[in-house]
Structure formats: structure tokens, C-alpha cells
């Protein structure tokens, strides 16, 4: 038999089950072989599937290397309908919430604003009390 460029794989798995003093053997085996030509076709197929997946991902989610406006032509029909303007929000357009002393902001917490909270300060101050004597140990009879 002449030597060929063949890759083969054989797997055998034997599982012995002992149940109620009865030995049952389950054996499975699988084997496959492929020539170099088959491996080349398999590699090309995997590469094609990977390339198609990357293209679909770029089309759906956008690719950082690709421009975002692939489907928009510079001279499109939008210029006939009207002017489209892109503006950025001004600082006055931002939503602001009123400051409430019982709800410190993140900046206040970062700068130590919680230490200026009256509840925090009252608990942090030392409590002056007199030491209490320990009770006598229990009497054993």
C-alpha cells in the first residue's frame, strides 16, 4: 500500500456500568480520515465562513476602520428636500437637578462632603461616658 498524505483520527470510549451485580459495557468508537486535498478544502471553507462573519459584523455594527456613512452619498436627495443641520448641545441645554443637602453629589462625596453631613459628624464625635464596672461572676453551686 503506497504512502499518501492522510491524516486519520480514531477515538474509542468504553464505559463500564455495574448495576445490581450485572456488568454492562457500553462502547462507542469513531474514526475519520482525510487527505491533504480534503484538509485544504476544509481550511478554505472555514476561512470563507470567518470572512463572511466579519463582513456581516461590520455591516451591522460598523467597523472602526470603515467610515460610518457608507450608504449616504455626498450629493443625495436630501439636498432637494431641505437642509439638514447637525448641532451640538449647548451647556444650557443640559438637564440639571437642584442641589439638596441630604443628597450629596458624586463630587461632594469625592471631595469629602459626607464628612460635612450632620449625621456623620454627630456619630463621629466622641461620646463622653463613665466606664461601668463589670458585673460579678455567677456563683456556681
Curated annotation (Swiss-Prot):
Q: Give the family, as the similarity comment puts it.
A: Belongs to the aquareoviridae NS5 protein family.
Q: Which GO terms describe its cellular component?
A: host cell membrane; membrane
The name this protein goes by in its record: Non-structural protein 5
Q: Where is this chain's protein located in or outside the cell?
A: Host membrane
User: RNA-binding: present as a keyword of the record?
Assistant: no
How is the protein disposed in the membrane? Single-pass membrane protein
What keywords would UniProt list here? Host membrane, Membrane, Transmembrane, Transmembrane helix
The record lists the organism as Aquareovirus G (isolate American grass carp/USA/PB01-155/-)
Q: What are the disulphide bonds in this sequence?
A: none
Q: Which residues cross the membrane?
A: 40-60
Amino acid at each position: 500500500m503506497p504512502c499518501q498524505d492522510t491524516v486519520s483520527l480514531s477515538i474509542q470510549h468504553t464505559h463500564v456500568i455495574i448495576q445490581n451485580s450485572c456488568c454492562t459495557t457500553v462502547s462507542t468508537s469513531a474514526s475519520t480520515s482525510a487527505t491533504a486535498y480534503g484538509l485544504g478544502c476544509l481550511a478554505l471553507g472555514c476561512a470563507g465562513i470567518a470572512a463572511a462573519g466579519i463582513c456581516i459584523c461590520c455591516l451591522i455594527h460598523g467597523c472602526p476602520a470603515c467610515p460610518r456613512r457608507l450608504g449616504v452619498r455626498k450629493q443625495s436627495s436630501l439636498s432637494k428636500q431641505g437642509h439638514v443641520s447637525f448641532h451640538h448641545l449647548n451647556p444650557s441645554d443640559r438637564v440639571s437637578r437642584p442641589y439638596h443637602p441630604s443628597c450629596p453629589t458624586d463630587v461632594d462625596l469625592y471631595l469629602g462632603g459626607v464628612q460635612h453631613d450632620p449625621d456623620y459628624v454627630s456619630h463621629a464625635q466622641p461620646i463622653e461616658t463613665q466606664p461601668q464596672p463589670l458585673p460579678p461572676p455567677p456563683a456556681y453551686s
